[in-house]
Every structure is written in structure tokens, then in C-alpha cells.
């Protein structure tokens, strides 16, 4: 987290007060860091007029005041305390004093849960290009719950849940009917939107090299260097959102307008020894729609054993293809 201070110095951090006080004492080499002129100057702050102390520094350790990430990083550089220890004491983060509060579990693990979050954002989700909030929409409660559970596990926050009013696809704008208390309240056949604060979107885009900015999506090259658990979660989530399983056609098929994105997923599948066919396309609403297909029982079996689906419907169809 401290590594992000150059870009997100304005993030406000709620950190264990006792620990922060000890950190400040260590940085100032003074039992009263809020009175230490050298520390006050180093942090680019000013003392109270005609006084020899800084009320803001005092407030960080005595008045439940959040501390800007930029200031916390500067304090850390004055001490020998490892960044991992400091991050373990962080309680919550906000993008500014009034942003939505999130409670990440540091260090953020590169695992299947994070891979699934990224995969769903690349699929039926997004990170708003202007306001940076994370959004995921689906009609499948299983996928909605998976995304919500993983976000809570990684970032310690529950979503704002809205049910979408039925509209004519591609002709009418999305309209939100009402806010829900639980995904279980979603009415059959309707879509549900999960909304999360900008803090998460900013962190994810920083980690994954601006992989999702509005409708512009990509997979950074370093993904191939990450562990298989992450890749498995990434592929599964994307196939749950964008893939189909056909009993009659005897194939698994992945659709996407973004040709480059499909090429990356074809290559990622090879790491699980699943071989997909070449990219093809068809024209829909005067626009190219790209796809590739997976055939053959040995590929179906490998996909089932190594990747699978969260969607019960797709998983059952895949079982039929194997049998």
C-alpha cells in the first residue's frame, strides 16, 4: 500500500492509533512528535500560530483523525519499521476524506479470489472511467454472490445492490428500479448491479496497469507470470460471464467484441493444457463479434478439472459433454 503513495497520496488511512503514535515517536525521536519542529517541517506542515505544536499531528493519534497516505509513507521512511508491519495495522482506506471506506486485507494476495474479481470486471463488470467505481452486473445470483463474497474477502466491503428495471436491450438506457438489501431479493429474470467505492477501482487499475477504464479493457502481459491459482480464477470468471456451453453443438464457446482479449485467453488456456480453436467472427448489428470454440472430450475434461464454472447451469452442461 505504501508503494502507491506517489500516485494516491491523497488516500486517507485509518490506522491503529497506538501503533501510529509509536511510529511518529520513532520518526521524530521525540516523545511528543506533534511538538517536534523538525518533524513538522519534514512533513510539510505548519504549527499552530504562536505555538510550538502541530494540531493535525496531534489529531492523528488522539482524535481519531485519518492520515493521508503521502504523510504516512514519509513517516515510514524515517523509521526502520517494515512496510508489511505498517500495512498490517491499517484499519481502512478512503479515496479522500469523504470517500467510501474500504478495509483491504494487506498484503493483497495474488490468488484465485483476486483473479476472479479481475475476470468478472473484464467480463460483465467495469471500472468507471470518470468516477473510478467498480461495478458488476448479472442476472445469475451465483455469479453475483461469488463477486460480492470475493470483494468482501479481499477488500472488506459489501456492495450497494440495485435491481435493474427491464428495458429493451441495446435500445433503452439502463434504469435502476430499487435498491436491495440482499442479492437473494433479486427478482427472477432481472439484472442486478453491485457498486463499490472508487478506492478499489483505483487500487485495481494501479496493480493491473489500467486494465479496465470504462469500456476499454485489456490484460497486462505480466499476468502470464502470475500463479496458476490467479489465472484459474481469472479464466473461470470470464467464461462464466462471456462463455456458453452447447450440448447440441458440442462445444464451449467464448464471445467478445475485443479480439485482443480473446487472444490472451486462448493463450492462458494452454497453460492448463486446454486447446481452443482459431478466432472467428460474425456480424451482429453491423459490428464484428469475435469468438473461439473448444472442442473434443479431452479438452472438456481438462477444462472441467482445471477451471470449471461457478454457474451451475454451465457446469451441468459441461458434465454432459464429458459423459
Which ranges hold each PLM region?
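Internal intein/HINT superfamily modules and their associated LAGLIDADG
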Residues: 1-323
Amino acid at each position: 500500500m505504501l508503494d502507491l503513495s506517489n500516485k494516491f497520496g491523497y488516500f486517507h488511512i485509518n490506522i491503529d492509533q497506538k501503533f501510529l503514535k509509536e511510529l511518529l515517536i520513532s520518526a521524530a525521536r521525540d516523545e511528543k512528535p506533534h511538538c517536534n519542529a523538525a518533524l513538522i517541517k519534514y512533513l510539510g506542515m505548519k504549527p499552530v500560530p504562536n505555538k510550538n505544536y502541530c494540531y493535525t499531528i496531534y489529531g492523528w493519534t488522539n482524535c481519531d483523525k485519518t492520515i493521508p497516505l503521502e504523510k504516512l509513507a514519509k513517516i515510514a521512511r524515517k523509521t526502520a519499521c517494515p512496510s508489511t508491519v505498517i500495512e498490517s495495522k491499517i484499519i481502512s482506506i478512503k479515496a479522500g476524506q469523504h470517500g467510501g471506506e474500504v478495509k483491504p486485507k494487506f498484503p493483497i494476495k495474488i490468488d484465485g479470489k483476486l483473479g476472479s474479481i479481475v475476470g468478472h470486471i473484464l467480463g460483465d463488470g467495469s471500472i468507471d472511467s470518470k468516477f473510478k467505481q467498480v461495478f458488476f452486473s448479472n442476472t445469475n445470483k451465483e455469479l453475483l454472490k461469488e463477486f460480492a463474497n470475493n470483494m468482501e474477502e479481499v477488500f472488506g466491503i459489501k456492495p450497494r445492490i440495485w435491481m435493474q428495471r427491464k428495458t429493451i436491450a441495446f435500445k433503452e438506457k439502463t434504469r435502476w428500479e430499487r435498491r436491495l438489501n440482499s442479492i437473494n431479493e433479486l427478482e427472477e429474470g432481472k439484472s442486478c448491479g453491485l457498486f463499490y467505492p472508487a478506492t478499489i477501482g483505483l487500487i485495481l487499475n494501479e496493480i493491473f496497469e489500467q486494465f479496465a477504464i470504462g469500456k476499454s479493457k485489456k490484460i497486462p502481459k505480466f499476468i502470464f507470470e502470475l500463479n496458476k491459482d490467479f489465472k484459474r480464477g481469472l479464466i473461470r470468471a470470464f467464461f462464466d460471464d462471456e462463455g456458453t456451453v452447447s450440448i447440441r453443438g458440442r462445444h464451449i464457446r467464448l464471445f467478445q467484441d475485443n479480439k485482443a482479449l480473446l487472444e490472451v485467453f486462448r493463450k492462458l488456456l494452454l497453460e492448463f493444457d486446454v486447446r481452443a480453436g482459431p478466432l472467428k467472427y460474425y456480424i451482429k448489428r453491423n459490428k464484428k463479434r469475435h469468438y473461439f470454440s473448444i472442442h473434443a472430450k479431452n479438452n472438456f475434461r481438462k477444462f472441467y478439472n482445471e477451471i470449471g464454472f461457478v454457474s451451475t447451469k454451465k457446469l451441468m452442461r459441461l458434465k454432459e459433454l464429458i459423459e
